[in-house]
Structure formats: C-alpha cells, structure tokens
Curated annotation (Swiss-Prot):
Active site: 314 (phosphocysteine intermediate)
UniProt region (B), positions on chain: 213-379
Feature: compositional bias, Low complexity: 15-26, 485-498
UniProt xrefs under SMART domains: DSPc, PTPc_motif
Residue span of motif Nucleolar localization signal: 1-54
Protein name per its UniProtKB record: Dual specificity protein phosphatase CDC14B
Entry's Gene Ontology BP terms: cilium assembly; DNA repair; microtubule cytoskeleton organization; mitotic G2 DNA damage checkpoint signaling; positive regulation of cytokinesis; positive regulation of ubiquitin protein ligase activity; protein dephosphorylation; regulation of exit from mitosis
Amino acid sequence: MKRKSERRSSWAAAPPCSRRCSSTSPGVKKIRSSTQQDPRRRDPQDDVYLDITDRLCFAILYSRPKSASNVHYFSIDNELEYENFYADFGPLNLAMVYRYCCKINKKLKSITMLRKKIVHFTGSDQRKQANAAFLVGCYMVIYLGRTPEEAYRILIFGETSYIPFRDAAYGSCNFYITLLDCFHAVKKAMQYGFLNFNSFNLDEYEHYEKAENGDLNWIIPDRFIAFCGPHSRARLESGYHQHSPETYIQYFKNHNVTTIIRLNKRMYDAKRFTDAGFDHHDLFFADGSTPTDAIVKEFLDICENAEGAIAVHCKAGLGRTGTLIACYIMKHYRMTAAETIAWVRICRPGSVIGPQQQFLVMKQTNLWLEGDYFRQKLKGQENGQHRAAFSKLLSGVDDISINGVENQDQQEPEPYSDDDEINGVTQGDRLRALKSRRQSKTNAIPLTVILQSSVQSCKTSEPNISGSAGITKRTTRSASRKSSVKSLSISRTKTVLR
C-alpha cells in the first residue's frame, strides 16, 4: 500500500454542506432555473456534495476546495492507493478500509474540529471516485449501522454514478462488481464474524500481505488463508520473492492451520509439510481456468472435514485459490457470487480472474442448495425423502440462468498435467512477478527478467518428485508431528480479524 502524508494546505473559504446534492460549492447561492427540471439532475462536471451525517460530508469536486473556519476538507486519493496488476483499480483492501475508518473517527472526535464540518472530497478521476465512495460506504455500514442499500442510495443521490470494479486479468473485461456488491459483502462479513475492526491487527495484515513476507491473507478468520505457492527453496532472484514451505510452517502452527491444499504444479515436495504435521492435498487444474465439478466437490469435502484452518495456494494464490475458497463461502454462508468475489478481493486484491467470475455465478444456485442440505443434515432433519427431493432439486438447476450466465452441462476437461505449466509463463507467473516488482524497493528490474527467473525456477524445482495427472489427493500426517526446520521470518502470532 502506498501512503503519503495527508495534504495540509491552507485553502480559502467555503462553508459547510447545506444540502444532499448540489451543483455548486456549499454556501454559494444557487441560481434557480426558470425551466421545470428535476432538481436532482446534474451536469457530469458539476461538484457534488453528499451529506453522510450532520457533520460528515462526501464530495466530488472538479476544482480545489477552499477551507474555512467551520469546514475541514481532506482527501485520501493520494494516500490510500490501489496497487493494480493491469487495468484493475479496486476495491481497496481491508487495511485501507480500516485506516480510513480510523481517520474519520479521529477527525469526528477531535476537539479542534468539534464545530467543523468534515468533508471528504475526491477529484475528477473516476477510479479514485469509486474507491473513495467505497470507503465512505464501508464506514456507513460498519460504524453508522446503515444497510448496504441505504449507504448506496446516499452515494448515488442526484444521479451520481460510479464506475464498477473489474478483475485483474490482462485485456478486456465482461464481468464487474458494483459498490452495492461490496457493501453487501462487508455487511455479511460483519454478520458472519469475518470482519471485526475491534480486534483487527493492521500491522499483521500489512506485513504478511507483502510478497517478501509470505504474500498471505486470511479470507475467513481462523478458517481460510490464501497464499502464493511455495518453491523448493527460499530466495530472492531478480526482484522475485520465492518462499520455501519452511517459511510458513511456524506461522501456520501458531494459527492452528492443519491442512494445506495445492492447486498448481509441484514446485516443492509435499513431504516438507506432512513431516511437519500437516495434511497436504493436491487438486490440480490449469492456471486461469475453472475447476471441474469433481475438484469442487473434493475441495469442499476436504475443508468440511479439516480439523483446523486451511491454507490454499496455486501459483499466485489469486485465481484458482480465490475461486475455490469462494465456492466454500457461497455454499456455507449463502452469499451471492458477486458479494463473495467482492469480499475475497477486499481481503486479497486481484483474486478470482476472467472466466472464474462467470463460473461462480453459474455455480451459485447449486452451491446454495448444497449448503441448505448440508445445514439441514447437521440439524438432524435429513431423511430419505429429503435426500431424494434434494437430489431432484439439484438435477433441475443445470439450465438455470443467473444474470444471463447459464449453468449448462459441459464436458469435463482432460485431467490436468503438471507439464502444462512447466514450459511457459502462465497467468500466475505474471501476477506474482507484478506484485513482487511493485513491492520491491527498486522497480528498475524489467518484468521480463523476473518472469524468466520464475520460469527457470519452475523447470528446476523438485526434479525428483513423481508426476501425477488429474486429481491427486495426499492426506499423510507425520506421526510425531515434528518439524526439523525453523521459520525464516515469521514471528507474529496474533490472528487477523478474530
């Protein structure tokens, strides 16, 4: 995350907001039009002021605001910035939401600002407008108790609009998530205990999300970690951070992780995790693709029977990893595909890419029904008739269309082979390289050099590991549950968002 000191310029005077939506700065007398027009309609280039509370205001301004004794303007556009992969630009991550909420609360409680209107303003950049509105909306949902719809209605008052968020894939995009999707995700995360800022560990989040410190994020506290794929040995080559299994072992033990699930080709020997006492499972499918029904079922079965938390990785820990964790969330928490994608990206930006988005929409109804049956069975309400009715219900959702995406029967792809990823640069390689490059102290290293290093390491990683095609499951656990290696850099033990 890039953070710059908040600008503290002395701008000339403007009184506080006096209306929900205005095409002029507050306090400036608005000239009434003789024509009978909708007073909420505005020109796209008009300044907009939206009252959040009697003291807090959100503004979209196309010129620099002027300060006054009774108003305090501030902007986070250059302070809390999204670190993009390609054309993606948001939503901002969980740490930035936390920082923003702390900033607002501090300003509202400040003795020197008790008589001032607090105006959070953003400029003409539509991407920054969307992220600023996202932060304001999250604050309304988390701290003001507004429903997602109430927060969204305030932000779109006067026909104000915001561009939707897209994925981190290279090229065009045909699937988007909206501010309302994000607000619903945050609300449900609070409802289900995923989000609790009273115990949020900001330092831990910002430390471990960096490529050099492990590149991991909790998606569901105490249940799911998404992390980048380990290599056979830890090293830094051409600005590209590679971590061995031993980098993660102590952290995983401290946080009750019992199960590791690998979705990409073998770049380390699973024995290095199993000898340390972890269960390890391999569920391979191609980088950038969607999982088969068999893989989804196997993943859910593993997670539902895991004794503790589950750590999931592919190459970058974004596409395949985010997709399968999203399947679990949709099944067990009945969140929509869009809400789930929004939440996973708020926790770990860049997650769920390309066709994986439509795949989740297609699977939504089926996963909800499976979740209903799962919960019914846990309550002891299952019987033969219920099971038969449920099976019939599931068989009827194959051609259901959700948001224009049809759930059609498709031929299962051929089993995935490790060789598919060995000889070329895949999407995961590019995303990992981009993240390593932008977070390294020097950005002077060409991306092609980092990618070349990554591919070479793939070809030489663990050459003696026996290959396997299709879905391979490994569930060995060391009898002694001992580890002969030490963590390279991880020392913190507090769980994020308990």
